Amino acid sequence: MFDEQGSPRMYANILLSTDGSDVAKKGVKHGIALAKALNAKVTVITVTEPLEIDYGGGHAGGWVPSKEEIDRFDAAHKESASKVLDEVRAMVEQIGISAELLHVPNAYPAAAIIETAKSKGCDLIVMASHGRRGLKKLLLGSQTSQVLADGSVPVLVVC
């Protein structure tokens, strides 16, 4: 991407990831402000993980959910993701930019973030240092670590 003078822009297409946690909201706010300052395109992603099924590890036990349980699980995740994205929608409208808002269901967050950045042509990922699973501020979250290790796009980590 190039600016009005024909000079290349460093970041023109930014992917923001959020799980709705307080630290993720902070990351989204930083990403939105950066996108506004750079006049960059914004895509926001929230990912909900698949239902874990216990096949019993080769033993007689295990648990396989019914269709109704799967439907309830999917509906709850869809509702949760909708709330997260509604909050982000309000943030981007308040600052005066537009954003594409995506929910990726039944996926693993790091893989979905990396794939979305690639498929959308993003040149920067902004994400929190840790999300809901973060135990301590001193530790980098597992999803963030995986995006840093496996991704090919620069990552801005907000703590």
Feature annotation, model-predicted:
Residues M1-Q5, E115-C159:
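Gly/Ser-rich helix-loop-strand patches that form or flank binding pockets
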Residues E4-K67, M91-E100:
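Small/aliphatic-rich secondary-structure junction motif
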Residues G27, D54-G57, A111-I114, K137-L139:
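Short, well-ordered secondary-structure micro-motifs
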Residues I45, L102-V104, V158:
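Structural motif
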Residues V64-K83:
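A short acidic, glycine-rich active-site loop
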